[in-house]
């Protein structure tokens, strides 16, 4: 089917979202809550675009709106830029030290600091809760309603069944989730509060704690499956690299036999 994207005719596959079609054609639509590996949730609203179908214009979120027929999409009109400017200003009040929001502020001419800082340290994109569910941790979830919505653990208690994989921290667009390894435990910190605490497995070679017990146990359970290569999960990455390098060196030098140097031979 044919789509008019910012005045240019492009071909699109039915069922593809506006965001997918835009990116395939080199059009940049800003997002904070979208990751291709997760189902779109349209939480941040930065990807709002203007859609014209059957002579009717309306605003839709590009990340989760599938195209079903010929249409026109406008991604960068003055009205859209004004809306994104306001969204960035509001989100910046929640995370005033976020570099991502500062960059978006420059892009859309936002008046950062227009709204009082409330330092919530969260833009409510929901990515951490969604990826936690996806990997099977089910530790984090969106709790509350309306302006009181927040990311939290069950009953606000420190979770002990967390995998400790760190996916929540890596996916956070404003880098507000902290992973701390102290002693034999890993702690996940959200809103400055301890969300989970997980024991770390010590390396059998050097004794250094290197990975969450629960996360490594799941990997070891799957190590016999065809799609998962077998690794020695009882030693840390540093010892594993050192052992691998030693084996490679021994294998390489076994090919050469060093002849003893005879006295009187020409050097």
Residue ranges: model-predicted function:
Residues 214, 218-230, 262-265:
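Acidic/histidine-enriched, beta-strand-rich ligand/metal-binding domains
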Residues 226-243:
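Cysteine-rich micro-motifs
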Residues 254-258:
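Long, low-complexity intrinsically disordered regions enriched in Ser/Thr, Asp/Glu, Pro/Gly
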Residues 184, 260-261:
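Intrinsically disordered, low-complexity coil segments
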């Amino acid at each position: 089917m044919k789509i008019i994207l910012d005045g240019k005719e492009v071909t699109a596959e039915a069922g593809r979202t506006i965001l997918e079609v835009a990116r395939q054609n080199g059009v940049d639509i800003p997002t904070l809550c979208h990751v291709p590996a997760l189902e779109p949730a349209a939480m941040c609203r930065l990807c709002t675009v203007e859609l014209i179908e059957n002579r009717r214009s309306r605003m839709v979120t590009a990340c989760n709106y599938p195209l079903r027929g010929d249409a026109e999409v406008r991604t960068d009109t003055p009205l859209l830029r004004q809306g994104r400017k306001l969204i960035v200003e509001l989100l910046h009040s929640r995370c005033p030290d976020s570099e991502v929001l500062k960059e978006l502020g420059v892009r859309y001419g936002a008046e950062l600091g227009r709204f009082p800082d409330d330092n919530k340290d969260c833009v409510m994109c929901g990515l951490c809760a969604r990826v936690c569910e996806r990997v099977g941790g089910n530790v984090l979830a969106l709790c509350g309603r309306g302006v009181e919505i927040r990311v939290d653990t069950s009953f606000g208690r420190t979770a002990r069944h967390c995998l400790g994989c760190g996916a929540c921290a890596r996916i956070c667009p404003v880098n507000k989730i902290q992973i701390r390894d102290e002693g034999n435990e890993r702690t996940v910190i959200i809103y400055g509060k301890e969300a989970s605490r997980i024991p770390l497995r010590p390396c059998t070679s050097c004794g250094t704690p290197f990975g969450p017990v629960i996360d490594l146990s799941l990997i070891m359970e799957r190590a016999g499956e065809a799609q998962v290569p077998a690794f020695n999960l009882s030693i840390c990455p540093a010892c594993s690299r050192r052992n691998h390098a030693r084996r490679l060196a021994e294998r390489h030098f076994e090919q050469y036999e060093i002849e003893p140097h005879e006295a009187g031979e020409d050097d």
